[in-house]
Curated annotation (Swiss-Prot):
Belongs to the class-I aminoacyl-tRNA synthetase family. This is Arginine--tRNA ligase. It is found in: Cytoplasm. Its EC number is 6.1.1.19. A motif ('HIGH' region) lies at residues 122-132. Coiled coil: none annotated. It comes from the Bacteria. Keywords: Aminoacyl-tRNA synthetase, ATP-binding, Cytoplasm, Ligase, Nucleotide-binding, Protein biosynthesis.
Length: 576
């Protein structure tokens, strides 16, 4: 359940009864310190100013009218008019009982929306590199979160599968008499790409043939289309290996490459001209946007068709948004693309809105992210200055985790050891990224991400194993916990209340696309459990009622940690 929403509703009703306008905001927040209660309502000051009242006087009136019977044990006014709410422990205990047995930990069902999430987007005929990591894992965390809440999520992998480079690649494959492209690994294609580019730059006859193949490919020539399809299939098969290793939910069925929108592009250019939005300028077709100015202070021109008839990324992105609304029926469209593309997207979407392709009621959201940097504060590279391949990064993560885990578990069976090492290594890379605000750059540091303390995947995975080990030692499962839950100690109350805030957290992540909020919550939860575990006897509690009650708190902690980590795509293990 969403306690914040419940209290906001109750406080808003009291504010309105006290004379506040119907659109007043209660501003209910989780309290930062225990002395200020579990929640604070901070909206009184703003409302008092509108009403010309003393905030304290309005706060007193609101508290008189505030009906939190059975929910709060105490309501206090602090400072100029803050309202501190202390939850009733019996009420908290009942809600924990409900969360333990309810579907989805008691998180309320949402009104399902169709939400398209654009993420990952690697290029064909190139291996995935570290630059693809953030979009892939942040986007997948958003997808998992939205799906958990009950939304209809459409994963859109906007693969770079079109352009002049394909003429070059097809021509080079032919030159090498290598028409059986399906037998080639992606590493061969990487080399082919480099050699094809070199030949294209140096051999005029070859470059003419490559350009001819581009025209043939675009006009539907069967041989060229078959070769192009092979290049796409080989690339995506290799990318699927990376997705599976990363525990990412993307599959080949989610590929919606640039080529998907080819047929729409001429229609869009014609339509934008017909609507008076696009004009001819020096042979090209341009949309001038008053919302953006060039260096001379004039409306910026956005080219949607070059004078040679070619289309641009902007044209494709306009078609893409239109397709996602009209064909996929999107209620909301999210783009996990790095921050450097922000102006490009905003310009495309401005045209989309002006043309009426996607109504204002359907949000187009750029959930941008910063760069992954090395310890030197520069873009993360190999020692020789090259781009780090994603597969190499994951190999190193597993290798480093292997040394850490094998050393601590010399007697663990080989199969289990391999699974734990993989979960910890891959989890460490993902969590290090997801635990940072996506809008900022972050420093990639092996030592920090594999540490067994602090806000890291290994610590979180270990925290989970510590909780489940309680049940192994107790020799009980959920069905044997039949006595009611009671909350008497402060540490029990703090842990129980934090457990009940899971819905507030996951709702925030779903709304804002901020997985670091979930990471912070889970880290806090693990710390609260550790304090509870150290100060409140569980297995040796003074009575069977308290023993079972504390086991129930431990059970919900385990379930919440596991579910929270799952929304991030981080695997848990039963022991480390």
């Amino acid at each position: 359940m969403n306690i914040q929403a419940l209290l906001s509703d109750k406080v808003s009703q009291a504010l309105i009864a006290a004379g506040a306008p119907a659109d007043c905001e209660a501003q209910v927040r989780q309290s930062a310190k225990a002395q200020f209660g579990d929640y604070q309502a901070n909206g009184v000051m703003a409302v008092a100013k509108k009403l010309g009242m003393q905030p304290r006087q309005l706060a007193e009136r609101v508290v008189e009218l505030l009906d939190l019977t059975g929910i709060a044990s105490k309501i206090e006014i602090a400072g100029p008019g803050f309202i501190n709410i202390f939850l009733d422990r019996q009420w908290v205990a009942e809600k924990v009982e409900y969360a333990l047995t309810a579907p989805k930990l008691g998180v309320a069902p949402v009104e399902p929306q169709t939400i398209v999430v654009d993420y990952s987007a690697p290029n064909v005929a190139k291996q995935m590199h570290v630059g693809h990591l953030r979009s892939t894992i942040i986007g997948d965390a958003a997808v998992r979160t939205l799906a958990f809440l009950g939304h209809n999520v459409i994963r859109a992998n906007h693969v770079g599968d079109w352009g002049t480079q394909f003429g070059m690649l097809i021509a080079y494959l032919e030159k090498m008499q290598n028409e059986n492209a399906s037998d080639m690994g992606l590493s061969d294609l990487e080399l082919f790409y480099q050699q094809a580019k070199k030949t294209y730059d140096e051999d005029e006859e070859f470059s003419l043939r490559a350009r001819a193949y581009v025209v043939k490919l675009q006009s539907g020539d069967e041989y060229c289309r078959q070769m192009w399809r092979k290049l796409v299939d080989i690339t995506m098969a290799q990318n699927q290996v990376a997705y599976d290793r990363l525990n990412v939910t993307l599959t080949k069925d989610d590929v919606m490459g640039e080529s998907l929108y080819n047929a729409m592009l001429p229609e869009i250019v014609a339509d934008l001209k017909a609507k008076g939005l696009a004009v001819e300028s020096e042979g090209a077709t341009v949309v001038y946007l008053d919302e953006y100015k060039n260096k001379d202070g004039e409306p910026m021109g956005v080219i949607i068709q070059k004078k040679d008839g070619g289309y641009l990324y902007t044209t494709t992105d306009i078609a893409c948004a239109k397709y996602r609304y009209e064909t996929l029926g999107a209620d909301r469209i999210l783009y996990y693309i790095d921050s450097r593309q922000h102006q490009h997207l905003m310009q495309a979407w401005t045209i989309v809105r002006k043309a009426g392709y996607v109504p204002e009621s359907v949000p187009l959201e750029h959930h941008m992210f910063g760069m992954m940097l090395g310890k030197d504060g520069k873009p993360f590279k190999t020692r020789s200055g090259g781009t780090v391949k994603l597969s190499d990064l994951l190999d190193e993560a597993v290798e480093r985790a292997g040394k850490l885990i094998a050393e601590k578990n010399p007697d663990m069976p080989a199969d289990e050891l391999k699974q734990v090492i993989n979960a910890v290594g891959i989890g460490a890379v993902k969590y290090a990224d997801l635990s940072k605000s996506r809008t900022t750059d972050y420093i990639f540091d092996w030592d920090n991400m594999l540490a067994l303390d602090g806000n890291t995947a290994p610590y979180m995975q270990y925290a989970y194993t510590r909780v489940v080990s309680v049940f192994r030692r107790a020799g009980v499962d959920e069905t044997s916990l039949t006595l009611p839950l009671v909350v008497t100690e402060d540490r029990e109350a703090t842990l129980a209340t934090r457990l009940l805030q899971f819905e507030e957290i996951i709702t925030t992540v779903a709304r804002e696309g901020t997985p670091h909020v979930m990471c912070s919550y889970l880290y806090d939860l693990a710390g609260l459990f550790s304090s509870f575990y150290e100060h409140c006897q569980i297995l040796n509690a003074e009575s069977e009622e308290i023993r079972q009650s504390r086991l129930k708190l431990a059970m919900l902690t385990a379930k919440t940690l596991k579910q929270g980590l799952d929304t991030l795509g981080i695997q848990t293990v039963e022991r480390m």
